[in-house]
Amino acid sequence: MKFRALLFIPLLAGCVGPAPYVYRHVPGKTAILRDGYAIAPPAAPEPVRAAIAAGNRIAGLPYAWGGGHAHSIDRGYDCSGAASCLLQAAGCLNGAMPSKSFRSYGESGPGEWISIYARRDHVFLVVAGLRFDTGWGHGPRGPQWSTKSRPTNGSALRHPTGL
């Protein structure tokens, strides 16, 4: 019985996921959030600046299931459409991907500038320390920048190569 219980521990560990996203300001490395828009830190490389600019263009648009998949510029975005939009702008992705595909995208672990938290049914990004998500909890839905913490249970933590 003891041996059988040990076999389940690795399976359960995969359900937990990485540590929750918690905002931490690092001077010169973290984007600043002002009036719902992100300001890139001075040291950010061009792909990160491009991702932030793309996020600012779609921030505040409504949530729309399937939004951002047929057109990179759309009237509304779902989580994977929004994540795809930013990664396309950064030159890290060709076309849109569904949430579950981000679980094997890029490289494992957190990135220096961009991190991807992907479950089968949801994905969000952390770009220069700010969370870009389509909502969590009881707040507004749709693409937006946030410094609010959120759980990451069941997420795979990935990042674009080199970022």
Language-model features: where?
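Active-site nucleophile-His-acid catalytic modules used for acyl/amide transfer and hydrolysis
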Residues: 56-76
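Intrinsically disordered, low-complexity
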Residues: 15-62, 138-163
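Active-site nucleophilic cysteine motif
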Residues: 71-90
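Short linear capping/connector segments at secondary-structure termini
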Residues: 36-37, 66-71, 100-105
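Bacterial N-terminal signal peptides
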Residues: 4-14
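Structured loop/turn residues at beta-strand edges in well-structured enzyme cores
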Residues: 10, 77, 112
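...with weaker cross-activation on analogous glycine-rich loops/strands in unrelated enzymes
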Residues: 49-52, 84, 88-163
